[in-house]
Amino acid sequence: SKTGDITSIGRGGSDATAVAIAKIFQTDSCEIYTDVDGVYSSDPNKIPLAKKIDKISYEEMLELSSLGAKVMQSSAVQAAMIGDVPIQVKSTFTERKGTEIINQENIDYTKAVTGVAYSKDDAKITLLGVEDKPGVAADVFEPLSKNQINVDMVIQNISTDGKKTDLTFTTKRQDCKNAISLIKSNKKIKYEKVYLNDKVSKISIVGAGMVATPGITYKMFRSLAEENINMLAISTSEIKISVIIDE
């Protein structure tokens, strides 16, 4: 630092530094070498049928990274997206072609789903009988934000009487007990009961091609139903569908 202090750049800091240097020198791409030969459609150590992805967009890689994919850190991908720096993810041990992380406009999508990610360290918290009025959700999440507790999926039920509703959200399992404690000590909100389920997992499918492909949501839900897997919560965006299930 300017004051001469020495500190660690943290996990993924070397990747982000490499991207920053590539941007400064305006190189054609930034090559990141790791212990795998690219980005896979899922964890190849757990899913034998996982396939290496030749090209993936910044947005898709950001989603997969945030959902637990460990090949690239979100900070490096975000820096590359802002600076429009193409990334080549390659193996240190082979000469095989890796994965290109590039602008979405330069990818010709032939498949709707690019990758599948999962995490086993989630918790689901539900507040029953919350007052149905403006500002309540903000009051619930304010102390969590101040205590650096990240909230992921949020689902609010439709109020049937216009007075009370239910609010469900997910956090990391390591934060759930602290979150419950903060909620119980929060005098700004009123609710009837609070439930915690800290034995849940999250499964997500990611793909920029989903927005133009009808039926992806149905296929995912049908696949889970055929395996008798019940969905506890659902969250969607243009390029991601996430569900919470029992562990």
Describe the function of each predicted region.
Residues 1-247:
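C-terminal catalytic "cap/lid" subdomain
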